[in-house]
Amino acid sequence: MELKVFRDVLPAAGADCTAKAELPLETELLISDYLPPVQRIVKCFAKPVVLQKQLAPGRLTLEGYLRCTVYYQGEEGAGLCQTEQKLPFTKALELPSFAATAWTACVEGQTEYLNCRAVNPRRIEVRGAYGLVVSVHAQLSTEVITALSEGGIEQKPVTLAGVRRAATLEKLVTIEGALTFPKPPAAILDITGTAEVRELKRMQGKAVAKGVLHVLCAWRAEGDAALRSQTADLPFNQILDADGLSEDGRCLCVLEPVGFAAAEGETTEDGSASTTLTATAMLRLSGWRPYQLQCVADAFSTRFETTLTPQTLATESLLCALDETTVLRGSGPLPDAGAQILACFASFGPVSLTRQEGRAVLTARAVVSAFAENTLGEMECYEKALDYALPLPADLPEDADAYPECWLSVQDLQCASAGGALDVSLTVRAEGAVLARQTASLVGAVELGDPLAPADPEVSLRICYAQPGEELFAIARRYHVSPGQMLAANDLPDGTARLDEARRLLVPGV
């Protein structure tokens, strides 16, 4: 008799690979005439901004720019000054060849080294390298057996649950607003920001993200070397086209500022100055749709020899969403006990997921750079490394692997000098999600062979001495009888799959 096989498709977890690459940095920065000449280099930073990702068989191509920012001490008491340059790059990373119906690539990294020197008061030379770490995760639509019928077939069902990646979108957006200073600024040294997505509406094929970008500006007034700070809130409302997104899915949205531009404004009658501020930010949207599918984990026939071809696949599930804030504190001695802190910055290395004392923990290394003026009037940079560790709000099963799809941002940073030591307090916000992968063993193919030998008519009773932990389905397969008949013949409760204790089982005749 012909066996009927029913199949369906589920989004199995696909490739999981990591690639590393180096972005060389070699450039010269010319100091504009309206900026003070260089007296002393304080610190140089490099940060990549990835604008496009293109996946081809065996290759991932990244396009973007590397922002090189140099802080220096200006001549003739000009104080702390800043200049920057954007260096475009295209980088191809070699990957294993794999098929995918959906994929995501998370780009992280850290500065490997930077050598910065002033060739003359109007020219700065920078040499260095930035190390990229790219994690690629894919899903692949895979056909599975969901049911079998006829041919005396018995099957062991298992329900697989997970998420289908419905949308992965990265879009560069522009947010405009006003930044008001109490008096016209002589120099704007740095503008940073943190975003807050307050409302996310999703509909068929679209998403609407609303929120506020909190901006913090470090600036200096005319004739004053002291740094001042000014804040502003820029509301945003972005409509995103995301095919595959639906109202019943799970959706996360993160906005990361990548650049700011301030245009000269007008001075009002009270002496304040209003500046037009344009923020460039990377809007990241991830959407998943949950699914459940009943599959066949094992099978046999009560009438024919049965040959099974196993199938092993991994499912992907959303372990937890992240929107957690953690405070890191540290201190260390200052080379000059009388140094005065002027400004501070923080950067993060790659995020990883480890198990510590049985719990899954998100870890990263944060480096705080504090600019200070020593007792000789020279500006220097002091650094303090902090270890970031965030226990996940959900338990990770022992048989599961997980990977983070999240971003770290600075919510607050305070540096102070007290008693000859540098005290640092860094508030870190983690946004995104953690996905888990679990392996399942299924039946990939079934083939019926010759009919089984007829039962011995002289054997009227068969008894099986079952051991604790044995599966009822395995016992039934051993004797080529239906598991349902085994339940009925031994008065076992419906749904019994495994024996809790040793017992004698009556094996019904075929």
Enumerate the predicted regions with their spans.
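Membrane-lipid interaction segments
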Residues: M1-D450, A455-E458
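Primarily a LysM-type cell-wall glycan-binding module
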Residues: G449-A488, P493-V510
